[in-house]
């Protein structure tokens, strides 16, 4: 038999879990138009004591591929990530290929992380080409037949990508559970002039948000009912 206090505690816990899940759903919807974004799911389970517990999981399903006019844009066909490095030497992995020519001519993410080991684009580059295997070539004029190789956009995979740690800004880091990044060779997965769209499903997200709002309202009503019953029982005893 549950006491008033245990019912209130359980409902407060469950409401807190629902608010946390609602925050993730809201973040997914906010990133609906973010290139390469992977939906973050807050999976809930009801334990034997009636308390909700949750686990955070990223959905790595590939989003749709869209063609762009930017030669620095790349999409990954299939599984894998592109390593990027911050100014402080921090290594992360992304599928957001909305790159640019940044400081000192290096190929960078939109927020200034170096792509791979550093790919410097020459100042006299007339044409910039990224081949399907990731090799990068620069042409100094429109009559060049064979450009100069200036680097490679690396592709890596993990033994258990589901256990990567999401650190924000479309970046992930390796964990002990995910295993170390393994360089993929002899592939044709890089598509220049393309970007991967977010894999967030707008319909599912809005539907989840509506259901959670209803659940939150119901949970708060239960607490109000229990509180009223508790106050009445106190008054009866005192009467």
Cite the ranges covered by each PLM segment.
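Amphipathic alpha-helical polymerization modules
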Residues: 1-239
């Amino acid at each position: 038999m549950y006491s008033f206090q245990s019912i209130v505690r359980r409902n407060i816990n469950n409401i807190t879990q629902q608010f946390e899940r609602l925050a993730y759903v809201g973040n997914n919807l906010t990133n609906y138009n973010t290139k390469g974004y992977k939906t973050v799911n807050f999976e809930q389970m009801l334990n034997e004591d009636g308390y909700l517990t949750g686990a955070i999981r990223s959905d790595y399903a590939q989003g749709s591929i869209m063609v762009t006019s930017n030669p620095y844009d790349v999409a990954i066909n299939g599984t894998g990530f592109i390593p990027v490095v911050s100014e402080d030497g921090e290594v992360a992995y992304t599928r957001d290929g909305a790159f640019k020519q940044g400081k000192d001519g290096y190929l960078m993410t939109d927020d200034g992380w170096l792509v791979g080991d550093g790919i410097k684009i020459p100042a006299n580059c007339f044409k910039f080409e990224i081949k399907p295997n990731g090799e990068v070539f620069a042409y100094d004029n429109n009559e060049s037949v064979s450009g100069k190789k200036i680097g490679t956009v690396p592709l890596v995979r993990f033994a258990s990508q589901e256990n990567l740690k999401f650190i924000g800004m479309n970046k992930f880091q390796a964990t002990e559970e995910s295993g170390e990044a393994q360089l993929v060779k002899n592939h044709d997965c890089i598509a220049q002039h393309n970007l991967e769209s977010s894999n967030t499903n707008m319909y599912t997200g809005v539907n989840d948000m509506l259901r959670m709002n209803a659940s939150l309202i119901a949970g708060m009503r239960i607490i109000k009912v229990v509180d009223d019953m508790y106050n009445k029982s106190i008054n009866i005893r005192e009467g």
